[in-house]
């Protein structure tokens, strides 16, 4: 297997397990539902999965909330941080120091933990520096060419974390080569996905009004970075060859985009659909989908697409879900897709290219053997990424960080020494 920075967390049977001899008190720092953002959904799913394991862990929530907002209010939140308020971060750090918390788990995205005024001002590193309990920080975005202020922020956050987690090997390499993060601190734990059994697909097709349709789908918060207009263009040609083809664009407009611009982008998609006469071939489902609804829509999907426009996107939760569902995927070649869809686990296309999207989608529809190979390879690659497995990996890492702090020894963490090539993207 290729030598990669960081130690690799694999399936539970690949772990050196440490005894969990007492209950851990863990503080989860993140946005949380009902706030509509990917990090909130991820944190909620991870915490629910940890609670369903046998790990002796008690979770407390530290919610990142909009300043002076009541929209994010939850009764089960013990601490609240006002997003953009550096003093609020430090106040909560001091409160955590007075608590019985053993370890802090942080879900990081730049917009949640800092502010911009021409350069990035990070609020997380001072928070971590003020903490007495050790912290594990998960980076959901790792940019290959960061602004100097962002590079410095990630370096400092990692320096004040006992361990850092990323979800792809590309991100692990960037942390080491670009940000100067000690590889011994870096763990690769895949994005979790629900356990999916698609034995009721026919019933679901009837419920959704999709019987007899070839379903192409994409889900997630809608915004211009998703490149959805190129899929609308694609459907003009796909529908001409396959009149039963239907594109489902599933998800609400990103709330921050809606606050700035209203529904301008969604309206532009609707106008294009009407102009091209595609009302019977493109359906926009303007809802924030629950986990079960996502699973149900994936069950009826024949081709999943992520026509995203940002080549530097290091992680896509929707792509992880589609692979976890064993779906044939077409995607632009952003960083996560390039790693995840290698070795015939999906088809990659160029950016902003309706012709390439059209060709790839038609290949999957018209070549049953190709579709079957893509589905089988996707399922095989994702078999260890179900939330129960990911939760056990995270729980073991949290325990190891606490054990290391208690031992006050310098030896590196040993959370996992082996990862299957299909899971990691490495080659054996």
PLM regions with names:
Residues 162, 280-287, 296-313, 327:
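Acidic donor-binding loop of glycosyltransferase active sites
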Residues 363, 370-384:
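A short, well-ordered alpha-helix in the C-terminal region of glycosyltransferases
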Residues 170, 192, 253:
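Carbohydrate-associated surface elements
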Residues 323-324, 328-331:
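Short hydrophobic beta-strand element within catalytic cores of glycosyltransferases
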Residues 197-210, 215, 269:
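A short helix/loop element that forms part of the nucleotide-sugar donor recognition site in Leloir-type
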Residues 260-288, 292:
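Nucleotide-activated donor-binding/catalytic signature segment of Leloir-type glycosyltransferases, i.e.
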């Amino acid at each position: 297997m290729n030598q990669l920075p960081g130690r690799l967390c694999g399936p539970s049977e690949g772990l050196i397990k440490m005894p969990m001899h007492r209950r851990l008190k863990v503080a989860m720092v993140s946005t949380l539902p009902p706030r509509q953002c990917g990090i909130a959904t991820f944190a909620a799913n991870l915490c629910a999965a940890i609670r369903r394991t046998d790990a002796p862990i008690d979770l407390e929530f530290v919610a990142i909330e909009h300043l002076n907002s009541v929209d994010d209010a939850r009764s089960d939140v013990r601490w609240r941080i006002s997003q953009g308020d550096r003093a609020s971060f430090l106040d909560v750090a001091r409160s955590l120091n007075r608590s019985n918390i053993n370890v802090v788990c942080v879900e990081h995205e730049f917009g949640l933990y800092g502010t911009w005024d021409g350069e990035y001002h990070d609020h997380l590193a001072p928070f971590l520096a003020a903490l007495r309990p050790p912290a594990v920080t998960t980076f959901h975005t790792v940019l290959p060419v960061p602004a100097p202020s962002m590079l410095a922020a990630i370096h400092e956050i990692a320096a004040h974390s006992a361990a850092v987690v990323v979800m792809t090997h590309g991100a692990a390499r960037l942390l080491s080569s670009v940000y100067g993060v000690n590889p011994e601190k870096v763990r690769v734990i895949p994005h979790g996905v629900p356990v999916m059994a698609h034995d009721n697909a026919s019933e679901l097709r009837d419920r959704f009004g999709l019987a007899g349709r070839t379903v192409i789908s994409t889900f997630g918060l809608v915004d211009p970075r998703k490149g959805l207009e190129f899929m609308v263009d694609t459907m003009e040609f796909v529908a001409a060859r396959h009149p039963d083809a239907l594109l489902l664009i599933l998800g609400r407009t990103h709330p921050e985009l809606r606050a700035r611009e209203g529904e301008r982008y969604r309206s532009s998609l609707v106008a294009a659909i009407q102009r091209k006469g595609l009302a019977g071939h493109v359906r926009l489902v303007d809802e924030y989908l629950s986990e079960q609804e996502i699973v149900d829509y994936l069950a009826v999907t024949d081709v999943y697409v992520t026509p995203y426009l940002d080549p530097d996107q290091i992680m896509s939760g929707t792509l992880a879900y589609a692979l976890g569902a064993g779906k044939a995927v077409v995607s632009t070649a952003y960083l996560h897709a390039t790693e995840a869809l290698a070795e015939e686990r999906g088809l990659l296309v160029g950016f902003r290219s309706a012709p390439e999207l059209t060709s790839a989608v038609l290949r999957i529809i018209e070549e049953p053997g190709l579709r079957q190979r893509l589905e089988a390879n996707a399922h095989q690659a994702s078999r260890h990424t179900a939330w129960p497995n990911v939760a056990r990996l995270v729980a073991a890492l949290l325990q190891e960080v606490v054990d290391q702090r208690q031992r006050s020894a310098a030896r590196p963490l040993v959370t996992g020494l082996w990862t299957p090539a299909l899971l990691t993207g490495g080659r054996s």
